[in-house]
């Protein structure tokens, strides 16, 4: 893309054929007539000839012209004067038009022209095999640079604001978690006060759960990472806090399951008690097997069991 440098005024004047500062042909002819030397002898003879020839050859200024001729002469003189004035106005208008300066509002700005000239120079240099290094500040106008700076500042401000928001949100979550834990502890203490005191078996279970929870939750222990999120460790904590304990069956007067005294909710599977008894040694009825081989001893044990 290139900018046209042709002046439209010069084109218009060249087509009209008018040359500024030079006299026209009418003025040149009048000047030539005025510059010619006059021959007084010829003028005197011509005046005598016209006088001797009678009234038909009299000087035009002494002739009696009819009224129509007078009106025609007056009209011709007025038309000549009007044409002269019009021509003079026409020349003045051309001079004014030639001196007039036109400012095109749609013309490209100076910064853009400069940048485009650098772009053309750069393209020419690339075609010649010698690239021209153009700085980043010359490739972009100043207003675009200011827009980029403002955009970078806005992005930095938004990033810092987002980080601060995340930090505040994390602090709020920690505060809420602490408040929930404190409220949970208060509720647990309240429920423990409302429930009936523990009997001997429930107290022993609570002490055992406290010992297990203290051992497994120790950070220095090698097994702490394995039990940190286990349900078993959570159950031991609830038993040690008194939230969960043994439930006794009033009909059998035995503990059958785990439950929460505050809510009455049952935890785990149903408990089935196992009767404690000692079984006799099955080898007492077989006798001595020391003198037998392994196959004979196995056959004897099998027959006795059947």
Curated annotation (Swiss-Prot):
Coiled-coil annotated spans: none
UniProt entry tagged with the keyword Ubl conjugation: yes
Post-translational modifications: Monoubiquitinated at Cys-4; acts as a signal for PEX21 extraction and is required for proper export from peroxisomes and recycling.
Record location of the Glycyl cysteine thioester (Cys-Gly) (interchain with G-Cter in ubiquitin) cross-link: 4
Cellular component terms (Gene Ontology): cytosol; peroxisome
Claim: Protein transport is one of the keywords in the record: yes
Gene Ontology biological process terms in this record: protein transport
Domain of life the protein comes from: Eukaryota
Main location: cytoplasm
Keywords, sorted A to Z: Cytoplasm, Peroxisome, Protein transport, Thioester bond, Transport, Ubl conjugation
InterPro entries referenced in this protein's UniProt entry, alphabetically: PEX18_PEX21_C
Family per similarity comment: Belongs to the peroxin-21 family.
Role description: Mediates peroxisomal import of proteins containing a C-terminal PTS2-type peroxisomal targeting signal via its interaction with PEX7. Interaction with PEX7 only takes place when PEX7 is associated with cargo proteins containing a PTS2 peroxisomal targeting signal. PEX7 along with PTS2-containing cargo proteins are then translocated through the PEX13-PEX14 docking complex together with PEX21.
Self-association state and partner proteins as the record states: Interacts with PEX7.
Protein name: Peroxisomal protein PEX21
Organism: Kluyveromyces lactis (strain ATCC 8585 / CBS 2359 / DSM 70799 / NBRC 1267 / NRRL Y-1140 / WM37)
